[in-house]
From Swiss-Prot:
It is found in: Mitochondrion matrix, Mitochondrion nucleoid. Belongs to the FAST kinase family. The modification N6-acetyllysine is found at K507. One of its GO terms (biological process) is mRNA processing. InterPro entries: FAST_2 (IPR013579), FAST_kinase (IPR050870), FAST_Leu-rich (IPR010622), RAP (IPR013584). This is FAST kinase domain-containing protein 5, mitochondrial. It comes from the Eukaryota. Keywords: Acetylation, Mitochondrion, Mitochondrion nucleoid, mRNA processing, Phosphoprotein, RNA-binding, rRNA-binding, Transit peptide. Pfam families: FAST_1, FAST_2, RAP.
Length: 764
């Protein structure tokens, strides 16, 4: 099965949804759209709380493409301009209620409603939020016809208050009458009159009209709403905080982004933020998150208020706060995140899945490792995963990989739940899940079923990858970390056409991802004959990654000290080379080459001009050795001596440096009989640096971020690098952080002894 997975043939890519699967599109008036959900904005990335299940019949996958309905009966009276007519006559069907739901399924959820659950938890929210469940006395059809007749007869004689009253009354029509009303030319005339009289509206009039528009489902794209937003902007400084939040909430219900209003609202908040109540604060953070628009200065002020109210906030509100900050791409301080983690841990069993995922998102964004939260998540998540939508599962999985947190129970639950519902995944979900498993270097018990289902889904999602090309390299790298190589998909990803598409259609620079994939295929798939990156792009990727790695390593004093000590021990910079043996693996190495007699070779020509090779001699380095250190070197003290014993025991005196014989550490054995302390490399000649090395060592200077959290298990990228180095004949020597970092506090001699043991013991 594994062999089959690694040689999957690329299917002919077809759109997931066919016209027959979708059903016949109906002619819809451009008013007749339930845009009050979240139309006009990007599909939300969060998940909903999935207590019940629903099964969808005869609907297209909304993940592959967003359906467009073109109207055929737009009212001329509502076309204030040709531009608005053309814009408003094309409607996006992205509301969950636009799909037909017959049975229950965990993948069908009303995310808009579930994000707003917190608004039902305190009576204070009713003052400054819109409640769609509010009912009013229904208006009869005959009464509505009478109102519309008056509009036609009196037109410009109607007063502003009468226009507002008519709009509010008409919104009380039964829902099934709304489409008829929106097709009415008299209603279109009433809307035009409202625009003409809008300067006479006060704040409450504006709020009432916006409520009517929400109930009737006025399209978010109509130019009439531009005029209403402008009026709201003019009214900001005359509104109370509750009114401002209510207006922002109504615009959210209309599905319209209101950047001008929010800019002025932010100015207002900078003066009045200290007066925010708890409910106003949480609601404001929700509004900010949904509009993705905020100043960092204001968010810092709001963070201080979160601390003020932290003991009064309930768990759903915690989830709302996290989601708002996450969507606005604003970080919370580690202190606040630890407070949030403590709140969640205190009652995690009662934390809704929606709030849990939102908190997880923020922990991933801030990269705060709350240990107790991680532990409790590992206990509760496996139970929740079967009832989560795949987007929620993706966020949990991505959290684990971002924090390097490998919990086998969580990962196994994810792997077990996905194959049967993989069709619900977006391309983004497939990519992030594969990346997470690959990053954590973990294969679940059902690995073959898990990976085959996701690889097959990649094939089915190819039209979507054309739209979001950044997700395909992510998929393939996650698979490569786990040693899966679907060659037809790789061939497509490295094709000139896809590379060009990736450069044109995404804001991300995918060269390093494609370069990593290209280099990996070159080593691990020797029989691969498909597309490869051009020489130019390979060079670009190599230079880009080397610049990053060199800058990173040269900024670390501990690495520079290690490099200097190795050069000292081996005899000079010509014996050690700091470079990227495998540039596509994104990290650098310290390479050392030994001859058949296990003596270092001066192979680094960048450090030693060729004409000077014949004059190379190992210089006296003046290393003083204690008796203890000599015993370690000459008697082969076990390397475990340096692991976990780098600090002096209580009451034990540190090693004292006395007048001992000074010898270099350049060879495998130290010649202590040489009283001058100098040792030459016998027979060194110009050809010495050209001889074939008996052994090539790739010294890895590691840190804790290359391992799973709290363990010594390498992450996927670094495990793949070791695998590829071995394929190329290198022997990996690891300077692990748990061994080397404590030694940095010890004497220079102890460091040299440790490095000597590492280099030459590994060669045996």
């Amino acid at each position: 099965m594994a062999a089959t997975l690694k040689s999957l043939k690329l299917l002919r890519y077809r759109a997931l949804c066919s016209p027959s699967a979708c059903g016949a599109a109906r002619s819809v008036s451009y008013w007749n759209v339930s845009s009050k959900q979240h139309g006009g904005q990007d599909p939300p990335e969060h998940i909903s709380l999935c207590h019940s299940a629903k099964r969808v019949k005869n609907i297209c996958s909304t993940f592959s493409s967003r359906r467009i309905l073109t109207t055929s009966s737009a009212c001329p009276g509502l076309e204030f301009s040709k531009t608005s007519s053309s814009k408003a006559s094309t409607l996006q069907l992205d509301s969950p209620r636009a799909t037909r739901v017959d049975e229950e399924d965990v993948e069908v959820f009303d995310s808009f409603a579930n994000i707003r659950v917190f608004l039902q938890l305190r009576p204070e929210y009713r003052v400054h939020s819109y409640n769609a469940s509010e009912t009013s006395q229904l208006l009869s059809v005959s009464e509505s016809e009478l109102i519309l007749h008056k509009v036609t007869v009196y037109q410009n004689k109607l007063q502003a208050q009468v226009i507002v009253d008519y709009l509010c009354k008409l919104s009380s029509l039964p829902a099934e009458q709304h489409p008829v009303l929106l097709r009415s030319t008299s209603f279109a005339l009433l809307c035009q009159l409202s625009v003409k009289k809008i300067q006479l509206f006060d704040t409450q009039d504006l709020i009432n009209v916006l409520k009517a528009f929400v109930i009737l489902g006025i399209p978010h794209s109509h130019s009439m709403l531009d005029v209403y937003e402008t009026k709201c902007c003019h009214q900001v400084w005359e509104m109370s905080m509750d009114q401002l939040l209510l207006v922002a909430d109504l615009w959210r219900y209309l599905g319209r982004k209101i950047p001008r209003f929010l800019n002025i609202f932010s100015s207002y908040l900078n003066l009045h933020w200290k007066d925010l109540s708890l409910s106003q604060l949480v609601h404001l953070i929700y509004v900010i998150g949904e509009n993705r628009q905020v100043s960092q200065d204001l968010m810092q002020k709001l963070e201080s208020l979160i601390l003020k109210y932290i003991d009064l906030i309930n768990l759903e509100e915690v989830g709302t706060i996290c989601l708002g900050f996450f969507k606005s791409k604003t970080s919370l301080s580690e202190f606040v995140m630890r407070k949030i983690g403590d709140l969640a841990c205190a009652n995690m069993q009662h934390l809704s899945s929606h709030a849990l995922v939102n908190i997880v998102k923020m922990f991933r964004f801030t990269h705060v490792d709350h240990i107790n939260f991680m532990k409790q998540l590992g206990e509760i998540a496996p139970q929740r995963i079967p009832s989560l939508g795949v987007q929620g599962v993706m966020h949990l999985t991505l959290y684990c990989s971002a924090l390097r947190f490998l919990d086998e129970g969580v990962m196994n639950a994810v792997a077990a739940s996905l194959p049967c519902r993989v069709a619900h995944c977006r391309s983004k979900d497939v990519a992030k899940i594969l990346w997470s498993f690959g990053t954590l270097n973990y294969k679940p018990p059902n690995a073959e079923e898990f990976y085959s289902s996701l690889i097959n889904e990649i094939h089915r999602k190819m039209p979507e990858f054309n739209q979001y090309p950044e997700h395909l390299p992510t998929c393939l790298l996650g698979l490569a970390f786990s040693e899966y190589f679907p060659v037809e998909l790789i061939d497509f990803a490295l094709s000139p056409g896809f590379v060009r598409l990736a450069q044109e259609r995404t804001k991300f620079n995918l060269i390093k991802e494609l370069y990593t994939l290209d280099g990996t295929v070159g080593i691990e798939c020797p029989d691969y004959r498909g597309n490869r990156l051009s020489t130019h792009l390979q060079q670009e990727g190599s230079e880009f990654l080397w610049n990053l790695a060199e800058k990173d390593m040269n900024s670390k004093p501990e690495f520079l000290e290690t490099l200097f000590l190795l050069e000292t021990m081996l005899g000079g910079p010509q014996y050690v080379k700091h470079h990227m043996i495998l540039p596509h693996t994104r990290s650098s190495d310290l390479e050392v080459q030994l001859d058949v007699n296990l003596k270092p070779l001066p192979f680094n020509r960048e450090a030693t001009p060729a004409e000077n090779v014949a004059t190379l001699r190992l210089k006296h380095v003046g290393v003083s050795l204690t008796d203890d250190l000599m015993n370690q070197l000459l008697k082969g003290k076990a390397r475990g001596h340096f692991q976990g014993k780098t600090e002096s025991e209580p009451g034990q005196q540190p090693m004292e440096l006395e007048n001992k014989a000074a010898v270099p550490l350049g060879g495998f054995l130290c010649n202590v009989a040489d009283k001058s302390g100098a040792m030459e490399m016998a027979g060194l000649c110009p050809s010495a640096c050209m001889q074939t090395p008996g052994m090539k060592l790739a010294i890895q200077f590691t840190n804790r971020n290359q391992y799973c959290y709290g363990s010594r298990d390498l992450l996927g990228l670094h495990s793949m690098k070791r695998r590829q180095l071995a394929r190329l004949g290198y022997r990996v020597v690891e300077l692990s952080y748990w061994e080397w970092f404590p030694l940095l506090k010890r004497t220079r001699l102890e460091k040299l002894a440790f490095l000597h043991e590492k280099v030459f013991t590994s060669a045996l």
